[in-house]
Amino acid sequence: MSPRRVTALVSLFSLSSIFVACSSDKSEKTDLTAELCPAKLTIQTDWFPELEHGGTYQLIGPSGTADKNSVSYSGPVQQQYAVGGLQEVEILTKNFDKQNSSVLVDAQADMAYIGIADLIKDSAALPLIAIAKTLDQDPQMLMWDPTQFTIKTPTDIAASGASFVHFPGLSYIDFMIDKGYLRPEQSDPSYNGSDATWVSKGGSILQQGFATNEIYKYENDILWKDGAPADVSFFTVSELGFDNYPATITMLKSRATELDACLKLLVPKMQQAWVDFYDNPTPITDRMIEINEEYDGFWSLSTELNLAGLQLLEEKNIGANSPDGTYCSFDETKIQDLYDILQPIYVSQGVEITDDVSSVYTNEYCQGAPGR
């Protein structure tokens, strides 16, 4: 064999070895990345499907499957959000039997919608951490019939003497009572999300709700006043001075630690889904109408309601970017201000909470997240 032939064979062998080694390294890295996330991700929301959950449903898109028995929506994650081996997403509606924090503790979901105010309240008792926002402002509101009550300022709520029907255990109720906006005897924690009490009482009560949903329903759909819909007035809780992050993506701290490498990849994708939803909400909001029909419960949506809700969401900056330009991170000053409001209230109630509010949230996983 000639020296030239030997040299050529050696060179060919060397190139082949390098190619195999590079291919092996690439394959190994791909395999490691593919195993970072669970194949199935379960997210517990705080209500039936509604536009305020749009970015979460965007992960699946309109082609998922609604299950009436489990009241859940599931399907393959859309390819543009697939990362770290994630294949399927399951979205659970509100669990009326337990708090969302208990759903996490019982390992029935990987993530759950929980507001920062409630995380503060439970901070000494439960090891939970918020990893991303879903909304920038809280659409939660207090509404009233303006023909029955003259309410111009928050203090007029207490002066009205009217019962305020709301869900139990809400932090903003503690705030309102502490500020003198609501007398303790006005608080009626019997709300179950339906319009039955309001209708039966002809709007002679105050009631909680989502400004981006119920305002349209009571003014256009629900026959509550003289056999017809009628105008209502409202304050959002932010307008009352309670500036909360609602429905944050929350996890058990131990689960977040376990999925740390996954979350660094996944959270920016989850927040991209929110940006994409806002850019083109109709496929998801239309599908939400159908999902609620398939659930066959008391909750319903309509095209007109969704359009009105999205308009109000923009007007009230409910879907605004964070100060750093992402649609993900938490404003440290905003959360500290909320903590400063709640801390003395809970001290007076004998409720133990953390001394360090930064322990209930992190912006670590928002690195690289997009903005609107």
Indicate residue ranges for each PLM-predicted region.
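Conserved C-terminal helix/tail region of periplasmic/extracytoplasmic solute-binding proteins
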Residues: 332-372
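Short, solvent-exposed loop/beta-turn-alpha elements that line the ligand-binding surface or hinge
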Residues: 64-84, 229-242, 257, 318-330
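Bacterial N-terminal signal peptides that target proteins for export
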Residues: 1-9
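Bacterial signal peptide processing site
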Residues: 23-26
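Secondary-structure end/capping motifs
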Residues: 257-348
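Pocket-lining segment of extracytoplasmic ligand-binding domains
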Residues: 117-118, 192-197, 201-296
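Short, glycine-/small- and polar/acidic-enriched structural segments
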Residues: 30-192, 205-208
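C-terminal motif of bacterial Sec signal peptides marking the signal peptidase cleavage site
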Residues: 18-21
